[in-house]
Each structure stands twice: as structure tokens, then as C-alpha cells.
A protein has these predicted regions:
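Conserved hydrophobic/aromatic beta-strand scaffold that supports enzyme active sites
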Residues: 3-6, 24, 45, 54, ...
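Unchanged
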Residues: 73-158, 162, 166-169, 181-195
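Acidic, metal-coordinating catalytic segment for phosphate/diphosphate chemistry
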Residues: 1-44
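Polybasic "coupling" helices that flank or enter modular domains
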Residues: 170-171, 176-178
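Short connector loops at helix/strand junctions that flank enzyme active sites
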Residues: 22, 37-41, 47, 61-63, ...
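Nucleotide phosphate-binding site architecture
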Residues: 5, 13, 28, 53, ...
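Active-site donor-binding loop signature of nucleotide-sugar glycosyltransferases
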Residues: 29, 57, 70, 118, ...
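Conserved Nudix-box catalytic region and its N-terminal flanking loop in Nudix hydrolases
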Residues: 47-89
Length: 195
């Protein structure tokens, strides 16, 4: 951090605030403590008559691969509002009846993903600027090797379990020695494909 976002001073230094346990950027001019924060991502597994909405990414990372609609929560938005907006932006779709599906904490990226299951109001879809294509697929038609992110695979598997939305799955995603991602789930670690 070069400048204080509060006063504009270039007198920002790393130090430990009184009573804190970590180093923070602190403005020497106005005293503002700048805390690093997690980014919140919201999205949904949206379905219509048992078929799942997938979006083909038009942007990096993972351009050309498939994902569920999701994105960063904007200031002043609830998690549900962000999931609804992202689905509309990426797939031209309207969703209702959002139910909490899963929460994924990714500390290595400073991100927390909150995913919902939701109902599509109609099967009419239109790819937005961040999508090359959008489609509805049955669970049997999912090409697991074409999915963009490990948490997308995990969320889809969780959606397909008999408990569905009944419990919140908090998984830790760990980088493996070969560059792949391992998912720690209920005490077990399973290997995911490399990204």
C-alpha cells in the first residue's frame, strides 16, 4: 500500500496496532489502520426441471471452461442479491427461491465463496459478456473435466447429495505438491484435477 485511502498521505507503514496480533498498514499521518479483508463471492447452482445451468467462461482464468454463475459481492449488496445479479449478468437468467448450499473458505486467495441452490424461472438463457455460452445440463451430462474451479465440482457434487441444502459444507482447499488442489472434507482429503 503506497497511499492512505482515508487522507491520501504517502506515510503508510507496516506496524502492529496496540492490542492487535498482526502487522497492518497504518497511516502515520491520520492514524487509519488498513485491515486486509477477504473478498466475498456469491453464486448459485441454478436448476430448471432437474437440469443445471452452466456458463462457459469468456474470461481468464479458465477461459473456455464451464462454471456456475458466481462473482464478487458488491458494496451494499446481500449475498442473495449478488447471486441473483451474477446469474442475470452471466446467463440472462432469473432465479428465485435461493437456499444456502455451501460455504467455501479459501484463505490462500483471501476469498470466501457462499453458494446457493436456486430455481430458474424459465429456461430462456442468453450468454452475458463474461460467458461464451450458457446451457442447461442434466447431472449425467456434466463433463467433470471441463469444470473451471474445484469448488464448482464440489458444489455440484454437494447439490447432488441426498441431503441437498440441509447442511452447510465448509471445505478447505489446499494446494498439493504437484500444483493440483486437494479438498479436505469431513476429515478426508481427496485429489482434484490440476488447474
Amino acid at each position: 500500500m503506497k497511499f492512505c485511502s482515508e487522507c491520501g498521505s504517502d506515510q503508510v507503514r507496516m506496524s502492529m496496532p496496540y492490542g492487535d496480533i498482526g502487522l497492518r498498514h497504518i497511516c502515520q499521518n491520520c492514524g487509519t489502520v488498513h485491515y486486509a479483508r477477504h473478498s466475498m463471492v456469491a453464486g448459485c447452482v441454478a436448476t430448471h426441471e432437474g437440469r443445471i445451468l452452466l456458463c462457459q467462461r469468456a474470461i481468464d482464468p479458465y477461459r473456455g471452461m464451464w462454471t456456475i454463475p458466481a462473482g464478487y459481492v458488491e458494496v451494499g449488496e446481500t449475498l442473495q442479491e449478488a447471486a441473483i445479479r451474477e446469474t442475470r449478468e452471466e446467463a440472462g437468467a432469473i432465479v428465485t427461491n435461493l437456499r444456502l448450499l455451501a460455504v467455501y473458505d479459501l484463505p490462500m486467495f483471501s476469498e470466501v465463496y457462499v453458494l446457493f441452490s436456486a430455481d430458474l424461472t424459465a429456461p430462456q438463457l442468453m450468454a452475458g459478456e463474461e460467458s461464451l455460452a450458457v446451457r442447461l445440463v442434466s447431472p449425467q451430462e456434466i463433463d467433470w473435466s471441463s469444470l473451471a474451479f474445484p469448488m464448482v465440482s464440489e458444489a455440484l457434487r454437494h447439490w447432488m447429495t441426498p441431503t441437498g441444502c440441509a447442511h452447510v459444507d465448509v471445505a478447505d482447499f489446499l494446494w498439493g505438491p504437484e500444483g493440483g488442489v486437494r479438498v479436505r472434507r469431513h476429515g478426508r482429503i481427496s485429489k482434484e484435477r490440476s488447474g
